[in-house]
């Protein structure tokens, strides 16, 4: 079969390190009857060992040439191939609690993570290869340089842990950045639940709009000092000093004031 050349427009970097591949599959812990979706199977580095353990494996792939390759693999009868853009894919269209795994294209990782948050209630767990810098932002704690909007929003939905450091030479072609594998497990009992999620999301986006400004300045169109203090937020603090549950509390407090 003709060798597949990685396509930059699809953000393709193919994992080839067998140790890393084994570590990822072991982290996923696939059981035969699990509902597993792999995003971006590429040259099937993770696909093959997953398929060996599963009765069926869903894969989402945008590259038509790779789709054609997948159909010729010895284990193709175990694959359910969904050709198309994962950003448009209906994860709820697959019944059952899902495990989702993938070496995610780094150029769409943030919008894809936000999309996946929307289906958190139907997910068992997720394991993704991402740019290490992105994973550090996802798992960051308040008062750290990496803590920001991405971390607040994803920590609302998931407990997350960085599992594996992955150097550039683990891929072909090698990316210019370090990578890491993150485990994401939907939280069973949130510290606080947003009464109006859209309002919560807007508030968090505004809070981190200008990181060097105080929370008072960034949220001036939504909240006054009295509102901030009512939920235990110091108006002089910056956004990165405020824990996710405080943003939830503030959003609910403000929503409760609207008549």
UniProtKB/Swiss-Prot annotation:
Catalytic reactions of this protein: adenosine(1518)/adenosine(1519) in 16S rRNA + 4 S-adenosyl-L-methionine = N(6)-dimethyladenosine(1518)/N(6)-dimethyladenosine(1519) in 16S rRNA + 4 S-adenosyl-L-homocysteine + 4 H(+)
EC number(s) recorded for this UniProt protein: 2.1.1.182
GO MF annotation: an example: RNA binding
UniProt-annotated location(s): Cytoplasm
GO biological process: rRNA methylation
Source organism superkingdom: Bacteria
Gene Ontology CC terms: cytosol
Keywords assigned: Cytoplasm, Methyltransferase, RNA-binding, rRNA processing, S-adenosyl-L-methionine, Transferase
PROSITE patterns xrefs: RRNA_A_DIMETH, SAM_RNA_A_N6_MT
Binding site for S-adenosyl-L-methionine: 13, 15, 40, 61, 85, 103
Similarity field: Belongs to the class I-like SAM-binding methyltransferase superfamily. rRNA adenine N(6)-methyltransferase family. RsmA subfamily.
NCBIfam families: ksgA (TIGR00755)
HAMAP family: 16SrRNA_methyltr_A
Function, in words: Specifically dimethylates two adjacent adenosines (A1518 and A1519) in the loop of a conserved hairpin near the 3'-end of 16S rRNA in the 30S particle. May play a critical role in biogenesis of 30S subunits.
Protein name: Ribosomal RNA small subunit methyltransferase A
Gene source species: Neisseria meningitidis serogroup B (strain ATCC BAA-335 / MC58)
The gene coding this protein: rsmA
């Amino acid at each position: 079969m003709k060798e597949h050349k990685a396509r930059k427009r699809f953000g393709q970097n193919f994992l080839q390190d067998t140790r890393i591949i084994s570590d990822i599959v072991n982290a996923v812990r696939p059981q035969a009857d699990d509902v597993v979706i792999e995003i971006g199977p590429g040259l099937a580095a993770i696909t093959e060992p997953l398929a060996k353990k599963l009765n069926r494996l869903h894969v989402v792939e945008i590259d038509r040439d790779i789709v054609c390759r997948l159909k010729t693999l010895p284990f193709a009868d175990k694959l359910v191939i969904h050709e198309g853009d994962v950003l448009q894919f209906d994860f709820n269209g697959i019944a059952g609690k899902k495990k989702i795994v993938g070496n995610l294209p780094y150029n769409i990782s943030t919008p894809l993570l936000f999309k996946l948050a929307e289906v958190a209630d139907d997910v068992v767990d997720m394991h993704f290869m991402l740019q290490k810098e992105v994973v550090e932002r996802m798992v960051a704690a308040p008062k750290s340089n990496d803590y920001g909007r991405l971390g607040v929003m994803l920590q609302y939905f998931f407990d997350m842990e960085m599992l594996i450091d992955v150097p550039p030479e683990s891929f072909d072609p090698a990316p210019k950045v370090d990578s890491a594998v993150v485990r994401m497990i939907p939280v069973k009992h949130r510290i606080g639940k947003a009464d109006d999620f859209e309002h919560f999301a807007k508030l968090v986006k505004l809070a981190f709009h200008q990181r060097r400004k105080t929370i008072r300045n960034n949220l001036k169109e939504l909240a006054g000092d009295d509102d901030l203090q009512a939920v235990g937020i110091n108006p002089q603090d910056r956004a990165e000093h405020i824990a996710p549950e405080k943003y939830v509390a503030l959003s609910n407090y403000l929503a409760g004031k609207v008549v």
